[in-house]
């Protein structure tokens, strides 16, 4: 009953990583895979991963149980200890986030991830989404198959109830862990499992199957919207994946909200609440023109610049505004261009600056005795190449179309106290290379990271 559906769901996949807690569900899944390897797919490569959350006094004994079980079934087991930070969304959400981060970090190149959620879990997920006031995306609950990390996540037991899994485990004389925290109904999921679903199932024995059908219909509607809005989203996005506010203004309120959700999802942001979506539009997109509005969605920041919305990753803090680079020393032959300094690693994951033989920004060479440094935070009046007059630094950034959050993170090259260039953006008249004379070429590699 369980083996053939699992065989069908695996398809051509022959390398699997199984989330193995040692509980009933994951024990059944792992046993089924072992049977599959023995009976149908001898080349099936199975690895298991156990996440030690450090939340239960018995956690170490659970690790021992999982190791013994995997040793008996000749399965490689990876045990990963994680740190849980419950401050933002509570223990349940924090544990889940840490768990899936560990899964992602340990998923090998050819592997797919398998987890053991079942029909009752799907029903609980649907009801929790209903309690939160979720729309069709949230009410879609859990997908049986979805992209994950560089691969896929499969939930092959999603159509089967816990009762079916328990009957299978008992028939196969399997041993599993009972987590005592599952009896604590202070947690929402446990409250549903212990106090609500038994009553619903007693009145309506097929309640879980019905909610699963509703979740499937919601998922279909979301997929249809994805297909219908894909072209609109593409048209409204710039090359930098920013989103046109003017384009959004042409859409109805419902369509605009759907496009915003898909834009955020495409960039890896968590699904925003209805309240967050309203704030995004009213407080960021529709803020007065001279404002610099921002809104946090999870750990990401939504900003506005020139009638476009941007979703920013968390930015590492720049803790110093001054970086000494080198002091130019005399060469044996004064007619020879001074030696180029070694590359300079920048703080806050900003990459590396270096002088190269060609390409980059052409600047005059530093003279003997000049100290080369890099600074952050442009101030004062600036006269750049190609402009006849000095301009205030803020005006320069505005004219060049540099968003406010990037301005303080652009390395500024100085020779002595003279500003020579803003890396990748402009060269000042003080830094201009003379025609037909030797010059240096400044290159900023933003992708290269130290370590």
From Swiss-Prot:
What's in the keyword line of the UniProt record? ATP-binding, Cytoplasm, Ligase, Nucleotide-binding, tRNA processing
InterPro entries xref list: Lysidine-tRNA-synth_C, Rossmann-like_a/b/a_fold, TilS/TtcA_N, tRNA_Ile_lys_synt, tRNA_Ile_lys_synt_N, tRNA_Ile_lys_synt_subst-bd
Name the chemical reaction catalysed here.
cytidine(34) in tRNA(Ile2) + L-lysine + ATP = lysidine(34) in tRNA(Ile2) + AMP + diphosphate + H(+)
Residues recorded as binding ATP, renumbered to this chain, are 21-26
* Record-level Gene Ontology MF annotations: ATP binding; tRNA(Ile)-lysidine synthase activity
Q: Which GO terms describe its biological process?
A: tRNA modification
Lipid biosynthesis found in the keyword field: no
Record's SMART domains?
A: TilS_C
Q: Name one GO cellular component term.
A: cytoplasm
Q: What is its EC number?
A: 6.3.4.19
Protein family per UniProt: Belongs to the tRNA(Ile)-lysidine synthase family.
- Check the record and name the PANTHER family matching this protein: TRNA(ILE)-LYSIDINE SYNTHASE-RELATED
Q: What does this protein do?
A: Ligates lysine onto the cytidine present at position 34 of the AUA codon-specific tRNA(Ile) that contains the anticodon CAU, in an ATP-dependent manner. Cytidine is converted to lysidine, thus changing the amino acid specificity of the tRNA from methionine to isoleucine.
UniProt-recorded name of the protein: tRNA(Ile)-lysidine synthase
- Source organism of this protein record: Yersinia pseudotuberculosis serotype O:1b (strain IP 31758)
């Amino acid at each position: 009953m369980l083996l053939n559906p699992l065989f069908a769901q695996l398809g051509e996949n022959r390398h699997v990583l199984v989330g193995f807690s040692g509980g009933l569900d994951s024990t059944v899944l792992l046993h089924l895979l072992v049977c599959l390897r023995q009976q149908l797919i001898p080349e099936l490569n199975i690895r298991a991963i156990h996440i030690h959350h450090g939340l239960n006094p018995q956690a170490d004994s659970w690790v021992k149980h999982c190791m013994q079980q995997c040793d008996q079934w000749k399965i490689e087991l990876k045990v990963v200890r994680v740190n849980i930070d419950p401050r933002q969304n509570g223990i349940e959400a924090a544990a889940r986030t840490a768990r899936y981060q560990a899964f992602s970090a340990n998923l090998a190149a050819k592997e797919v991830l398998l987890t053991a959620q079942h029909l009752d879990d799907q029903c609980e997920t649907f009801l929790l989404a209903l309690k939160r006031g979720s729309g069709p995306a949230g009410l879609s609950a859990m997908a049986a198959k979805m992209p994950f990390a560089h691969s896929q996540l499969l939930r092959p037991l999603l159509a089967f109830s816990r009762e079916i899994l328990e009957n299978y485990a008992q028939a196969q004389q399997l041993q599993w862990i009972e987590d005592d925290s599952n009896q604590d109904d202070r947690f929402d999921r446990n409250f549903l499992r212990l106090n609500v679903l038994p009553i619903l199932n007693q009145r309506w024995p097929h309640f879980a199957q019905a909610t699963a059908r509703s979740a499937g219909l919601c998922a279909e509607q979301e997929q249809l919207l994805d297909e219908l809005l894909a072209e609109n989203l593409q048209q409204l996005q710039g090359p930098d994946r920013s989103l046109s506010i003017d384009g959004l203004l042409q859409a109805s309120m419902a369509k605009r909200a759907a496009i915003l959700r898909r834009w955020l999802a495409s960039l890896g942001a968590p699904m925003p609440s209805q309240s967050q979506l309203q704030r995004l539009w009213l407080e960021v997109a529709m803020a007065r023109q001279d404002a610099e509005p921002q809104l946090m969605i999870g750990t990401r920041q939504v900003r506005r610049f020139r009638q476009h919305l941007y979703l920013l990753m968390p930015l590492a803090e720049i803790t110093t505004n001054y970086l000494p680079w080198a002091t130019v020393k005399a060469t044996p032959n004064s007619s020879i261009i001074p030696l180029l300094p070694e590359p300079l690693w920048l703080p806050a994951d900003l990459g590396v600056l270096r002088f190269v033989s060609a390409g980059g920004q052409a600047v005059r060479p530093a003279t003997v005795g000049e100290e080369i440094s890099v600074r952050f935070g442009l101030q004062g009046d600036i006269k750049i190449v190609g402009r006849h007059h000095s301009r205030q630094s803020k005006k320069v950034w505005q004219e060049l179309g540099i968003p406010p959050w990037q301005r303080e993170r652009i390395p500024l090259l100085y020779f002595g106290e003279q500003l020579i260039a803003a890396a990748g953006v402009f060269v000042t008249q003080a830094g201009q290379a003379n025609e037909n004379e030797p010059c240096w070429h400044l290159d900023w590699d933003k992708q290269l990271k130290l370590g």
